[in-house]
């Protein structure tokens, strides 16, 4: 199959390329990038007036399989990704059973091959059962092709255990991803600890819990000369810790979510559970620090932490509702509306954070538009105005902090291995 993407503005951070050109695709691979390309019998995709970027990646997603198909499935989650312009996701291991062995990884690969609409990377657990007591079968999972290791949802408390995990993962050239909240400080907390939580009478999760955990991981990475990736960073001090560590040459990377860049804990005054997430949406000083971290490259990646729940779970008293909400179908619109169109970040920075940088962190041969590479592309309409309607999401999860908001900018098409899997909002 031959596809010719014509006349788009190609924004390609790996090449520092930002120009109008064509992309010729044959048999799932990029054959040529240049001006005035042609090919007999090719399907033409007119990208005039649109941005063509390397396929967007979301390295922090919960597809909820195995074991929680009421919340999400590989099929529904990857349809949501395609609808949102995401060509590849990495799914976290806090499932039932936990993805902590080669056998479970192999079963996941079988389902992914048959059900996924976009590419799916698997993240294996650091510890058996996410208990932080015994290392999971990391070597065997690495051989099965997992992209990274994480006990996401839980902080790896034991320092010596984490040190060993970092050293072991590095033997297989895999990165450790850590959910950084010191558990004794956040136990029972339901929102950011601060003025708003005090006024509402809700037990908070203090910023210092993240600061301590991030500092610990940075020092361990520095001591072991191994990489560590900080999941969903959300505090001012944590951002500064990463900034200074990078200056010292520590192999630390960090991600942030749209919700931590856009909202503050003031939205929690409504007691709406669609804003409840861990780490919590924080105060303005923390939000602004995250934006500054993305601007100067301290924060490498923008991810969703897409965490669907059944509606009955979220539709209950605030303190009882689980944390997490969906994000795959809104991340592009949210980032274009509140970060790009506001002048907070330029388009090259946005594309890098949502594609190229994530490929680099996970060691993937992706995130670049160049001959010989897989033809994974995200096509953006920067000026498309639309209203978020969670009832129409492909995801099973319908709780979204962005519901009913008006966005400017949307994914116009998603191309995976040279095949158009989404066009104008419809997953094909």
Model-based region annotation:
Residues 133-302:
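Histidine/acidic residue-rich metal-binding segments in metalloenzymes
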Residues 102-119, 167-178, 330:
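Alpha-helix-loop-beta-strand connector modules within alpha/beta enzyme cores
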Residues 1-54:
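Histidine-rich, glycine-flanked metal-binding segment
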Residues 8, 23, 28, 49, ...:
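Divalent metal-coordination and catalytic microenvironments
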Residues 59-72, 121-134, 203-207:
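Active-site mouth loops of central-metabolism enzymes
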Residues 317-320, 341, 374-428:
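C-terminal cap of metal-dependent C-N hydrolases
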Residues 48-112:
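Metal-associated gating/positioning segment near the N- to mid-region
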Residues 199-227, 274, 295-296, 300-302, ...:
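His/Asp/Glu-enriched, well-ordered alpha-helical/loop segment
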């Amino acid at each position: 199959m031959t596809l010719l993407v014509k006349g788009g503005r190609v924004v390609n951070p790996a090449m520092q390329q930002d120009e109008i050109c064509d992309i010729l695709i044959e048999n799932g691979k990029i054959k040529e990038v240049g001006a005035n390309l042609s090919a007999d019998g090719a399907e033409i995709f007119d990208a005039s007036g649109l941005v063509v970027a390397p396929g967007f990646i979301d390295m922090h997603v919960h597809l909820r399989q195995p074991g929680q198909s009421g919340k999400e499935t590989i099929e529904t989650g990857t349809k949501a990704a395609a609808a949102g312009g995401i060509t590849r996701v990495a799914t976290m291991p806090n499932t039932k059973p936990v993805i902590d062995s080669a056998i479970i990884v192999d079963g996941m690969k079988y389902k992914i091959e048959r059900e996924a609409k976009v590419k799916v990377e698997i993240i294996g657990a650091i510890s058996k059962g996410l208990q932080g007591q015994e290392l999971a079968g990391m070597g065997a999972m690495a051989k099965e092709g997992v992209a990274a290791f994480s006990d996401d949802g839980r902080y790896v408390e034991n320092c010596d255990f984490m040190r060993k995990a970092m050293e072991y993962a590095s033997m297989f050239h895999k990165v450790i991803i850590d959910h950084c909240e010191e558990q004794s400080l956040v136990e029972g907390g339901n929102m950011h600890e601060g003025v708003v939580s005090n006024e509402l009478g809700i037990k908070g999760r203090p910023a210092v819990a993240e600061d301590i955990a991030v500092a610990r991981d940075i020092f361990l990475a520095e001591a072991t000369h191994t990489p560590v990736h900080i999941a969903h960073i959300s505090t001012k001090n944590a951002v500064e810790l990463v900034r200074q560590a990078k200056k010292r040459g520590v192999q630390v990377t960090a991600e942030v979510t749209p919700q931590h860049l856009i909202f503050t804990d003031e939205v929690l005054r409504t007691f709406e559970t669609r804003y409840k997430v861990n780490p919590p949406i924080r105060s303005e000083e923390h939000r602004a620090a995250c934006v500054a971290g993305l601007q100067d490259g301290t924060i490498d990646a923008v991810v969703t932490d897409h965490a669907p729940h059944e509606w009955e779970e979220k539709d209950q008293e605030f303190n009882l509702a689980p944390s997490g909400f969906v994000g795959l179908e809104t991340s592009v619109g949210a980032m274009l509306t509140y970060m790009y169109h506001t002048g907070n970040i330029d388009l090259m920075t946005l594309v890098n954070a949502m594609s190229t940088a994530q490929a680099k962190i996970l060691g993937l041969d992706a995130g670049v538009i160049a001959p010989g590479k897989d033809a994974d592309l995200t096509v953006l309409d920067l000026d498309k105005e639309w209203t978020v309607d969670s009832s129409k999401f492909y995801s099973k999860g319908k709780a979204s902090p962005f519901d009913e908001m008006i966005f400017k900018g949307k994914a116009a098409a998603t191309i995976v291995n040279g095949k158009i899997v989404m066009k104008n909002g419809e997953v094909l």
